[in-house]
Amino acid sequence: MDVGFSRTTVQTLSRSHCKNIKQKISQWEGRANGISNPEKWCPKDFGVRYNCHQEIRLKKNPIAERKSKNLDVTSRENVGLDINENTKSHDQSENENKKHEYDDTHFFKNESESNWVCSRVKEIESCKEDVLDPETSLPPGNFYTSQILWKKIEALPPDKLLNLALEHCDSSEKELNFRVLDSSYGITKSLENIYSEPEGQECGPSINPLPKPRRTFRYLSESGVTPYKERNCDKKYCENNSCAQSSLASSQEPEPKKYGGKIRGRSKRKSFEFEDIQHFRNRNSQTIREELGRNSGSALYYTQSEDNIYEDIIYPTKENPYEDIPVQPLPMWRSPSAWKLPPAKSAFKAPKLPPKPQFLHRKTMEVKNSQAYLRSKLTKDTTLPVTLTEWKLFRAGEVANTKRKNLPRLVLKIDDIFESKRGKKKVKLHSYTGKELPPTKGETSGNESDAEYLPKNRHKRLAQLQPSSKRNPHYQTLERDLIELQEQQLFELFVVVSLQKKPSGISYIPQVIQQFPGKDDHGYKQSKDMEERLKVIPKFCFPDSKDWMPTSELKSETFSFVLTGEDGSRWFGYCKKLLPVGKGKRLPEVYCMVSRLGCFNLFSKILDEVEKRREMSPALVYPFMRSVMEAPFPAPGRTITVKSYLPGAGDESIELCRPLDSRLEHVDFKCLFKCLSVCHLIRVCASLLLERRVIFVANSLSTLSKCGHAVVATLYPFTWQHTYIPVLPASMIDIVCSPTPFLIGILSCSLPQLQDLPIEEVLIVDLCADKFLQEVSDEDEILPPKLQAALMQILEERNEILTQEQNFSQDVTLNSLVSEAFVRFFVELVGHYSLNMTVTERGERVFQREPFRKSHTSRSVRHFLDLFMETQMFAGFIQDRELRKSGVKGLFEIRAIQYLETIPESEPSGMNRILRSLGSKMKFLQKK
């Protein structure tokens, strides 16, 4: 677009931008001698493109029409944009473009054309108030903008448009220099030409280079000096609009950097066209500005760095950068290291973004604390606690202060008793080097107390008594059993067993008189295994069938038995013995439910409902049992409802609740402590830990079954893997002669037959008299003395502890007390097993036996582990942990983690420390 400039203005502008003395002299000589070359009168291109059709449009458009459109052009010009050629003008001939193209290195052409230039300038000055057609004079579109954008903002008033532009200029990195010119000069000119020659070069001939892309927005010149006239205009404008500018400026956005007192030039600036256009469009919308508030602006962030555009990033700071990151809680069996925990809030400083938290990337804990371990090819187990060093780091943080805060009072009481009896001796970590460590000569040396010295003959005796039974590859744990039961039914079989006379008429034999599901039921197919079980179930329902005679009075009795399959699976039989409805002397009947779920109380309630219906009619049992079998399998702590019809009462709903703690579902410790003293109970448990043979004798089926289940429950987290028959029928008494380990209960009437059998190395316990009928005589020396003393103290003071704890919590029961006491006992023995789990290169977990055993500082514990680690219970326990792909979440693992948190760093102590220091000094002297 052609804009008129007076001769004085052109000379002033050209004089202010002369690069050297030679140009100034040439300019002065031109003024003094007169201009002969008209091309030299052409004004220099100061960043403003001229329309080649200006002359034609000035003749066609009337003055009135141009005045009416002056407002729109002014609004576009005041934005501070470089107005380029219209895209329509590029379609004209090449001659017209060359005719109006100006040289970038000269201000004037040949002197022969001076008259034409003067007339041309006068013509422009006469039409200085004229305005072009707004549609034609719009800035052309480029890579970043288009004419459509300018058409959308064309209708805005000039004041509002300029204020919006100034608002953006105040919030950008470098303030744009808007100039308010007189109405006669309604357009701004850039004081720099990108086609001008570099400094220090001679003005050469005119060159017409290819057009380069120009920025839409105009920035300050490199010198940073504003002409005097324009500074006055800016000052006047700022005085009139100071309030508006102060309200629009944002205090949060950074101020432009200055380098050596000068604002960085255009050549050193990064491109902001896209950001500025986006920001400018957002400023036009009042709704967007209200929603975004003070932080409204471009969605892109501005860089302040001159060297690297990714160096400093302005980002709105937060009090906690991790507050928007949902972090899932870690599993209970492993805790994160301190280096994985997010740092304090004070560590985050704006404007730099903090790095991505490491705990979002890593899913395992691997802290290696020795060079030997680093050289090994095996890695630590990732599903359980790894090293003591990691636990020290973890306790050093905030968790250390609340280590004992959330533990129940009962657990704290038990821990205090064990710590007082045991002393300061705890396990120490042995770094695994990839080889089995051989027994060292000084392993048994140390500062052990005299009470812990073990006679050699005793250790030899225990080793000889240890049975060498074949391990069962099908190891069953309570957790695995419960997983397998999720898809099972509540029970497998229900039978009613009665006594029938033998053909000889002298004695009675048990027979099944009612069965559900029946053999003829549709859809029921009896397996071969079930047929074998049906043959022996009547014998377990009446283990003393030959001693029964018809009677008119009989006290109801409940008991249970266990059937062990060849694969190690167990079936629980829940029985209730009673007299059938009738008059006179009658033979008793037994209701028996066979299930894979160990929950005595739940099935006792079902058997009570069966008894109620069978008294009315045996036909009512089938509908009820079918509704129970179709009921869903209850989860721990859940209740299921069974609906059935009862004549005279109508429809009934029976709620069956399964206890939350599945370990103690079929356990009654009251009966166990009623029959056995604490001293005898500890000796029985010690014999079972070494997998010896144990026989219980009692005159009641319920006593035998309850005591047998309770003793087995004390072995948690280990599971008895061998023969387990709480009630053994008299006809099967020969089983006690088996050389394999077993736990068997027999009635007192079968005791004479038992004494006649050749039995060796067996512990026979009379539950009614609380005494040992036969023993090996070393049962009280099996367990470590200090741990055994702590366990005995807790069990002997159980009533006092329960009385104290029940004042604070009603959930404390005898079962929970006994369970926590034995769990703590085993945590002291094997609670550090996870520290000796390694993972091979193939991803297989491997247990390191020798480092595990030697990690105990107590010699008595190490001697016990020598024997206990050879049992099938321990082997199955480790095998189950090795094969599991996910961590175990039982009570034992929870208490083991809490125990590992209290382990101090392993340091040499006592005589060992002195001997090691002397050894190092001797080696040092030998080197000299």
Swiss-Prot record:
Q: Name one Pfam family in it.
A: uDENN
Q: Which SMART domains match?
A: dDENN, DENN, uDENN
- Keyword Acyltransferase listed? The answer is no
Q: Where is the uDENN domain?
A: 492-641
Organism domain of life = Eukaryota
For the region Disordered, give the residue spans.
67-105, 245-266, 428-456
Which residue intervals are annotated with compositional bias (Basic and acidic residues) in the record? 85-105
Q: Which Gene3D superfamilies match?
A: 3.30.450.200, 3.40.50.11500
Q: State any GO CC term.
A: nucleoplasm
Instruction: List each copy of the dDENN domain by range.
Output: 798-888
Q: What keywords appear on the UniProt entry?
A: Guanine-nucleotide releasing factor, Phosphoprotein
* Disulphide linkage map: none
Q: Is the Phosphoprotein keyword given for this protein? A: yes
- Function statement: Guanine nucleotide exchange factor (GEF) which may activate RAB9A and RAB9B. Promotes the exchange of GDP to GTP, converting inactive GDP-bound Rab proteins into their active GTP-bound form.
Task: Report the protein name in the record.
Answer: DENN domain-containing protein 2C
**Organism, per UniProt?**
Homo sapiens
Q: What is the lineage of its organism?
A: Eukaryota, Metazoa, Chordata, Craniata, Vertebrata
